Amino acid sequence: ELRFTKGIEFNFSESATKKIAPGQKLLIVANEAAFNLRYGHPSTPQFVAGTFFKNLSDSGERIKLSFGAGTPVIDFNYDDDSPWPVAADGDGHSLVLIAPETNPDPNLANNWRISSQTKGNPGNSDVIHFEGNPNSDDNQNGLSNLVEYALTGKIIGNVITVQNQPYPSISYIRKLGSDDVYVSIETSQDLRKWNNSDSNYTILKEEYLGDGLIKITLRGINPIHENNLISFFRILITQR
């Protein structure tokens, strides 16, 4: 017997669908009639298993999917504060687990993103898979195919002031759904040796721009001091 025991209440023994294929999606909804009206379905689609009870908290909580006497299948906590995708908090986007086929840890905020459009993609996927040679520059604009798959626009470095302290900041525009890659921050003192600096930056702001684009602004966790060594940064795009 498979059922949700934390967050919402739903027992899959009562599901309209008794089995699904690998990679197939199954939905449980709060109200079938309202779901069909919102998404333009004349009748309830086959991928809707049924309706759940209780509502998820807008401020985050624990979700647990259990088997049998309570053996956890999935057990995690989500939140609505950074570093979790804050654009999913009241702006109409759903939270999307990135590359679920790789079995990512759902407790980690960086394994989630917002849907590329408001209202989400129930029953479907908004993932854009990469095709082609990652190192080629098919349109001859000086950027590799892999970079253009993940990002658009300019990458901007800046200095911002927080409580009278200067901090480094980095802004870039990410294409939502480009889940075949990781986006990382690297820094260097000499432009020869580069180090991963993801842990040295925190998300300051996420701004949905429409058309499946999101502007992400990161801020260094440490202020800039006069005796700091000059630091350079770059964004590294790598395939999963």
List each model region and its residues.
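Short, composition-biased motifs enriched in small/polar/acidic residues
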Residues: 121-240
